[in-house]
Amino acid sequence: MSLQHFIQNALSNWMRQEGPESDIVLSSRIRLARNLDKVRFPTLFSNEEASAIIALFEEQFTGYEVPGIGKFELVKMDQVQPLEKRVLVEKHLISPHLTEASFGACLLSENEEVSIMLNEEDHIRIQCLFPGFQLSEALKAANQVDDWIEDRIDYAFSEQRGYLTSCPTNVGTGLRASVMMHLPALVLTRQINRIIPAINQLGLVVRGIYGEGSEALGNIFQISNQITLGKSEHDIVEDLNSVVAQLIEQERSARKALYQTSQIELEDRVYRSYGVLSNCRMIESKETARCLSDVRLGIDLGIIKGLSSNILNELMILTQPGFLQQYSGGALRPNERDIRRAALIRERLKLENNGNRQEDETI
């Protein structure tokens, strides 16, 4: 299995499979920050120390199997082309920060549910990404990988403070739990404007699809914990679970109310967006995200039938600049990307329609 597997096999498990509450919760992610004992943190370490960490993981962990998760392959950032790095970021397998690290690397599981980033902000960042609302399952997998690593190396740990990290906000459990949610009805009814401040008051953060500093394109929001010290991993996840469950209920209520009070307007919006995606010859990323959000809402409400509900997950990633350029075989100017994006969307919708036609003929 090579890096090309991750680039060309475009659909990760969280995009391809449906999990619990997947009409609203697109994915659940757990990230654990860890550092090696008696080794300077990445903000201060030398090139030799950084290289030694990669060598250690190459020797101790590459090719070895974690029960239920599989084997890992090491990808060194200095051996990856800029375009390939961008694709890995767009698939949420690595962070933008890692792409800039001179001695960065990543261990990737074959099914792409688990990635272990090396020499990012911390020596080790374990990430587990699951489809739908599965925070507890993702935490279980992350802890399994964490134990597997800790059996072979010693972590920087304080009895008083917990796991020691480069950034003080990660000290303690080192845990970041997050979910990606599609909340179009709360946006359309403007309820989101009062909900976000209320969530922030609970010690949670609301961001866009690519985390800190990113925009909530396509009405997709990432909600995560902010506090890692003074709470157990279980409590952090349960607190987030509770808020997400309430958001799911509020979004479903808003969808029902929209459909009951503004059915024609909603159907018009959905079908207009579907028409744009089906027929456009050029389309920018923001318009793509808006139209995909409308179509996914239409699928979930039963307005549009015969389309996969995963189409939002897939095309939100596949129409990003890195994937588009990979799809076309080289660098593209912005207007060329808009043309390629439109072609890819039309092709994907055509595949869906052809699949439905073949099923009808079989019946």
UniProtKB/Swiss-Prot annotation:
Appears to be allosterically activated by the binding of pArg-containing polypeptides to the pArg-binding pocket localized in the C-terminal domain of McsB. The keyword Transmembrane helix does not apply. A motif (RDXXRA motif of the pArg binding pocket involved in allosteric regulation) lies at residues 337-342. InterPro entries: Arg_Kinase, ATP-guanido_PTrfase, ATP-guanido_PTrfase_AS, ATP-guanido_PTrfase_cat, Gln_synth/guanido_kin_cat_dom. It comes from the Bacteria. Residues 24-254 form the Phosphagen kinase C-terminal domain. It is an enzyme of class 2 (transferase). ATP binds at residues 27-31, 92, 125, 176-180, 207-212. GO terms for molecular function: ATP binding; creatine kinase activity; protein kinase activity. Transmembrane segments: none annotated. Keywords: Allosteric enzyme, ATP-binding, Kinase, Nucleotide-binding, Transferase. Coiled coil: none annotated. It catalyses: L-arginyl-[protein] + ATP = N(omega)-phospho-L-arginyl-[protein] + ADP + H(+). Belongs to the ATP:guanido phosphotransferase family. This is Protein-arginine kinase. It comes from Bacillus licheniformis (strain ATCC 14580 / DSM 13 / JCM 2505 / CCUG 7422 / NBRC 12200 / NCIMB 9375 / NCTC 10341 / NRRL NRS-1264 / Gibson 46).
